[in-house]
Amino acid sequence: GTYALATVSKINNMDELTEEIIQKGSTHFLEMSGGDINATELVATLINQKDNLIEGIRYAQERIDGALTLLLLTPDGLYCARDKLGRTPVVIGRKEDGYCAVFESCSYLNLEYEDDRELGPGEIAVLTPEGVKTLVAPGKDMRICTFLWIYYGYPSARYEDVSVEEMRYHCGMAMAERDGF
């Protein structure tokens, strides 16, 4: 079926996957200006190789060496899948008349959503106006990217209930102590 896809990914085996798909002759890729293949397009192609979205998402996560977190919008709902090792987050927000899913918790604060929960590693859920349903239970192995707190994350964001701003403050204190300040 038709869907819209957003990804946060680091695909270490992108060249191998692309070559394998091209050899099968089942698709073609559009190149970006630098001549590279778009990672989101590759993920969509992997998903489409299976009979349904859930199998396709799991297949893409299994085949990719690296990290893949995604949001996939269909007429039936918004499918959310966190990286199998939890490297990058998916946060669910809620308010009286609905739900949202974002990659960073501060994204919906001005829209009057409140934190509902973060998906666990490898968890797949679907959001509809009626609620959030877990389709694949979360795993136990969490390896969240530490750069979220010290580099990438917006200061007002929280990951696994740890504030980016507070983490940076504490890191600064530790560096100052180490350097004798």
Residue ranges of predicted features:
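Conserved short alpha-helical segments that host acidic/polar catalytic motifs at enzyme active sites
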Residues: 1-121, 126-181
